[in-house]
Structure formats: structure tokens, C-alpha cells
Curated annotation (Swiss-Prot):
Note: In plants, chitin acts as a microbe-associated molecular pattern (MAMP) that is recognized by lysin motif (LysM)-containing plant cell surface-localized pattern recognition receptors (PRRs) that activate a plethora of downstream immune responses.
Gene name for this UniProt entry: Chi
SMART domains: Glyco_18
Induction: Expressed during the biotrophic interaction with cacao.
Signal peptide (UniProt feature, chain positions): 1-23
Name of the protein in its database record: chitinase-like effector
GO molecular function, one term: PAMP receptor decoy activity
Superkingdom of source: Eukaryota
Length: 438
């Protein structure tokens, strides 16, 4: 039986002590009755109580599979990979589409993973693929239909489970997403029904969240999500995109801590998110920390990029919101989102993109003006010629997040995404910090 920490303060105190120290430093195929267990010791428990094995997880983006093929995955360093994304295509039958994710790549990927003893889940939804999720769980009939759709898909493709990537129940993500005040309650009913299915009872079942627990019927972060912990094998708070082009200034993509920042710069962090999810009833060992192997680019004038009279990069400098820097070749180009709204270039640099574009050296060390922020424990790099600043996690940031995972007894990590690293610099760093071998 899980008993949450008595207060957020308890976890924050432990975390502060940790941060102070850091500052100084071939499975078989299966039929409907029995899901495949690529790494049997970490198979879903059927009641959400599988906590015995550290989870080293990564997302595999199907739309990038031509650039990042299964044979390029460092299989021995992962226990799970989530194939992104399966998208419900309508508000009636909730059929899944992988049209945007190279559907033909899924089965070969699953085969390759299982040959290496690694489990594969399908990530359902995503930021641009959650338009119909509210409908899919809105009533008993829809939930039953959606459960059947998902179970049939899992069986057909020999998957080990599902990752529900609905980041904003009862909270507007894309402007055309369906929302309902009862989204979070309905999501729980759906997950409970999925667990009652003979296949669903045995699969890995996880869900993503943000820096606060899912939104309740009153529009506030839920105070009690302990029932989710009974049906899910793990919850992954996505601790990235905390700052970006929507923010008032440049800021850390994934702050480890922000209690040392000015109050108006405290937008949430790894430390605060873990404390809030735990206080709301998710056991620490069921929290798998979502980390990002990429950074956000901002247009920052040279007169604002440095501390006055120095070559030290400034903290939280203003940026030009009218200029949207292009990222690397995996960046989302300017276009139209699923709602028909025009969108600019995404300004995203993968870790290898930072090397390819000259922000970092081949070994991940700084090549351009650089700052490691002692508060957020994240990195910044600046291209003076193009006047672009990028906030991101470097190897030190990943190592410290790994150490935090270990110190707090979390369930593991989940990196977005497996193909964004360079020569496993980040993957090795977080594994090292968590006490795992390279």
C-alpha cells in the first residue's frame, strides 16, 4: 500500500540536499490471451504494481525512421521503446492511424526490439494527435469501442503495451482539441476498463503528464490521482518545454530546480513536478522522469545576450518574438497545424543538431559562447553571427537528472527522443548518474 509523502516540503528538502551535493560536483509471438514480454522481468503487472525493474525508456519517432533506423538504436541501453504516435482519427470508431509515423516501419521495429530483449509500446496521442481523445473516453460505449481498437492493435502488431500520451485532459492543448470537464475522471474509467480486458490486464500501461497532475473538473491540478497508480505501471511527467517561444524571455527547457530563481522565473521544474505528482498519490517508484534531448532556439540581440561589459551569457534575456529561428533538419517547418492554424518554424535543435550547426564540439563540449546555469542546472549556447541562443540539456544536465532519479528512488527515465542524441552522449550521462553501466 502506498503512502504519499506527508508534504511537498519533505521531497523538496531531500532534493535540496541532493542539489547542494551536485553543485559541488527473443521473446515469442503471442495471441489474444498473452501479450508478448520482450523483457519478461518488467512486463506490465495487470494491476499497475510492476515496480521491480529500472525503466530506461526512449521514444522512437516513426516519421524519422528513414534517418534513424532500428539498427542504429543502442538496444542494450534501453528496457523500453515507445513508438510515436498512434493517432485516433475520428470521434466515432477511434481507429488508429500511423500515417504520419511511417506505419510500415512499426512491425520491423517491434521485431528488432524483441530480438534484443527490449519491450515496445505504442504511444497514443501526442501533442498534435489528441484531438479526439476526450470523445474516446467520454462515455461507456466510447470507452469500450476504444479499448477494443487498442487491444486489437496491440495484438496485431505484437506490442508489449500502450503509452497514453494525452498531455492536456480538460485543458486546451491545440485549439481544436475536444475537452470536457470530466476528462481526467473519464480517462481513469477508460484505463480501468482496459485493465479488465484479458490482453490489457497483462500489457505495459503508462501515461504521460506535465509539471502538475492532470486537470480536475474544476480546472485545477488534481489533488488525488492515486487511483491511476493502481492501473498504470508508470506515469511520465514530461519535464521539458517548460520555457519556449511562448515565454516572456529565454529560459531553461528542462530545469532540474528553480527555487533559486526569481519568483516570476519559477515556471516549474523536475523537483517541483516530482513532489506534486507524489503528493497527489503516485508512488515515487512509479514516476518515470521525462527528459528532452533537444533545445529551443531564440532570436537574441547581441546587446542583450551578455551580462553588461562581459562575455558571460545573460540569464533570462529578452528575445525577438517576431523572428523564429530555424532548427536542424528534424525541426518542424513553418506550416499549418491539425487545427488549420498557421505555425512558424519550431526552432528545435536536437543534441546532434547542436553539434552539426556548430554550437557544440563532436564530444558535446562547448564550441560557441556557453553558460551552464547553476540554478536550473541546464545549458545555453549562443551563435553571435546569427544572434540565436539555444537552451538545452547537455551531458552534465542529464547526469544530474540521472542522479536525482537515483536519489529519490524514481522508476527510471524516458527520453524524447532516442534519435536526438549523438553517440549516446546524453544517454550514457543519465545512465551514469542513475548508477547504471554505460
Amino acid at each position: 500500500m502506498f503512502t504519499p509523502l506527508s508534504s511537498v516540503t519533505a521531497l523538496l528538502a531531500l532534493s535540496s540536499a541532493f542539489l547542494g551535493a551536485q553543485a559541488g560536483c527473443k521473446p515469442k509471438n503471442y495471441g489474444p490471451e498473452k501479450p508478448h514480454g520482450g523483457n519478461g522481468g518488467n512486463r506490465g503487472s495487470g494491476n499497475g504494481n510492476s515496480t521491480s525493474k529500472f525503466i530506461a525508456k526512449g521514444y522512437y519517432t516513426g516519421w524519422n525512421s528513414d534517418d534513424f533506423k532500428p539498427e542504429q538504436v543502442s538496444w542494450s541501453k534501453y528496457t523500453q521503446l515507445a513508438y510515436a504516435f498512434g493517432i485516433p482519427t475520428d470521434s466515432a470508431n477511434f481507429n488508429l492511424s500511423l500515417d504520419a509515423s511511417n506505419a510500415e516501419s512499426l512491425d520491423p521495429f517491434v521485431t528488432a526490439a524483441h530480438e534484443h530483449g527490449v519491450q515496445v509500446t505504442l504511444s497514443v496521442g501526442g501533442w498534435t494527435g489528441s484531438l479526439h481523445l476526450s470523445y474516446a473516453v467520454a462515455n461507456a460505449q466510447n470507452r469500450t469501442t476504444f479499448v477494443k481498437t487498442l487491444v486489437d492493435f496491440v495484438v496485431k502488431h505484437k506490442l508489449d503495451g500502450l503509452d497514453v500520451d494525452w498531455q492536456s485532459p480538460n485543458k486546451l492543448g491545440l485549439p481544436c482539441n475536444a475537452i470536457n470537464a470530466n476528462d481526467t475522471a473519464n480517462l481513469l474509467l477508460f484505463l480501468q476498463e482496459l485493465r479488465k480486458d484479458p490482453v490489457g490486464a497483462k500489457m505495459i500501461l503508462s501515461a504521460t503528464g506535465n509539471i502538475v497532475p492532470w486537470t480536475d473538473a474544476n480546472g485545477n491540478p488534481s489533488a488525488d490521482v492515486s487511483a491511476f497508480g493502481k492501473v498504470l505501471d508508470h506515469v511520465t511527467p514530461l519535464l521539458y518545454d517548460v520555457w519556449g517561444s511562448w515565454s516572456d524571455s529565454v529560459g531553461p527547457n528542462s530545469p532540474l530546480n528553480d527555487t533559486c530563481a526569481a519568483p516570476d522565473k519559477q515556471q516549474g521544474s523536475v523537483v517541483s513536478a516530482v513532489a506534486k505528482w507524489n503528493k497527489a498519490g503516485i508512488p515515487l517508484e512509479k514516476i518515470v522522469l521525462g527528459v528532452g534531448a533537444y533545445g529551443h532556439a531564440f532570436s537574441v540581440n547581441k546587446t542583450k545576450a551578455y551580462v553588461n561589459g562581459t562575455k558571460e551569457l545573460a540569464a533570462y534575456p529578452p528575445f525577438n518574438k517576431d523572428i523564429h529561428p530555424k532548427g536542424d533538419k528534424w525541426d518542424d517547418p513553418a506550416g499549418v497545424d491539425p487545427c488549420g492554424v498557421a505555425t512558424p518554424d519550431g526552432g528545435i535543435f536536437t543534441f546532434w543538431g547542436l553539434i552539426e550547426h556548430g554550437y557544440l564540439n563532436e564530444d558535446g563540449s562547448p564550441k560557441r559562447p556557453y553558460r551552464f546555469d547553476n540554478c536550473s542546472r541546464t545549458a545555453y549556447a549562443y551563435n553571435e553571427e546569427e544572434q540565436v541562443m539555444v537552451s538545452f540539456d547537455d551531458a552534465q544536465a542529464f547526469k544530474e537528472k540521472g542522479a536525482f532519479i537515483k536519489s529519490q528512488g524514481l522508476g527510471g527515465f524516458s527520453v524524447w527522443n532516442a534519435g536526438s542524441d549523438h553517440k549516446d552522449i546524453l544517454l550514457d550521462a543519465i545512465r551514469s548518474g542513475a548508477g547504471l553501466s554505460k
